[in-house]
């Protein structure tokens, strides 16, 4: 255990930030899964609505450094491609 005051503070901050990051990462995964679930159900309107919710979450978390910007771009691109293919079919 840390003895120095600043090290104790850093340890507390790490716990709080870790809890926040876990919750936000879970929210992100849930948003992406909702889009995928709508796509699997062939629900174009539902997928589009879920994507409209997931896209700003991906952007926000990539800007904050929670996920890499390329990962966010890859998710958005692949989901959007699937939505377009479903709408065209």
Curated annotation (Swiss-Prot):
Q: Which UniProt keywords apply?
A: Ribonucleoprotein, Ribosomal protein, RNA-binding, rRNA-binding
Set out the biological process GO terms recorded for this chain's protein: translation
Give GO MF terms, alphabetically.
small ribosomal subunit rRNA binding; structural constituent of ribosome
Q: Among the entry's GO cellular component annotations, what is one?
A: cytosol
InterPro entries given in the database record: Ribosomal_bS20, Ribosomal_bS20_sf
Q: Superkingdom of the source? A: Bacteria
In terms of Pfam families, this protein maps to: Ribosomal_S20p
Cited function: Binds directly to 16S ribosomal RNA.
User: Any idea what this protein is called?
Assistant: Small ribosomal subunit protein bS20
- Species, as recorded: Stenotrophomonas maltophilia (strain R551-3)
List the gene name. rpsT
């Amino acid at each position: 255990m840390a003895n120095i005051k600043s090290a104790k503070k850093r340890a507390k901050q790490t716990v709080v930030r870790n809890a926040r990051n876990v919750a936000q990462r879970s929210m992100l995964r849930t948003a992406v899964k909702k889009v995928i679930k709508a796509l699997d159900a062939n629900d174009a309107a539902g997928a589009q609505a879920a994507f409209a919710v997931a896209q700003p979450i991906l952007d926000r978390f990539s800007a904050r450094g929670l996920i890499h910007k390329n990962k966010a771009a890859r998710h958005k691109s692949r989901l959007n491609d699937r939505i377009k293919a479903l709408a065209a079919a």
